[in-house]
Amino acid sequence: MKTFKEFLEESSLSRIKSKSDKGGMAVISGSRGDKSKKENKARAKQLDRDIKGKGLPGATKVSGRWDEKDDDTGKTTKVKERSHVVTSGKKGKRAFKKAVKSLGKKYGQDAVLTQTKKTGTVSATRKGGLGKQAGKNVKRFTAGTMKPGRSSAEGDTQIKKKTFAYKK
């Protein structure tokens, strides 16, 4: 049986890194920049329930930063939000990605980050979520590999004051 301290240590950067190395993990958030703090907190709780409802193991809560684009003005703002790191559990790659993308769509997210094997992929969950390139909507792009201890201009994730980002 684990002690309480051992239980608390489980949700650390090294644990997330080991799950990342095994493959089959995703980062998703229920927060939106246009919602109040209270609404975002309620959405994060509901997202936690929805993750378990999709048959995925419980998520590790982290703090994330992301550039969010306003649909009306087209203005980009840096948003700090509560994110969830989810592993695939017993789900296959396709079913896992599908479940995570559907959750991203439900919560109106621009995109979700999924990782199978070594590289992470950022997939749009709504039209125009990742902007346009050469006049066409971007559906997905490769984020690179997980780099613990680094931060990125596009966005990064933090757990217990330790940061990680995806870089090529």
List the predicted regions and their residue ranges.
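Short, flexible beta-strand-to-coil junctions
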Residues: 29-35, 88-91, 115-120
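Extended, charge-rich low-complexity interaction segments
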Residues: 90-103, 146-168
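N-terminal, charge-rich interaction modules
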Residues: 2-58, 159-168
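Surface-exposed flexible segments
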Residues: 36-51, 98-105, 125-129
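Short, compact, well-ordered microdomains
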Residues: 94-119
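Short, surface-exposed beta-edge/turn micro-motifs
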Residues: 22-25, 80-83, 108-111
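Short, low-order "capping/linker" segments at domain edges
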Residues: 73-81, 122-152, 167-168
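Short, intrinsically disordered low-complexity segments
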Residues: 53-94
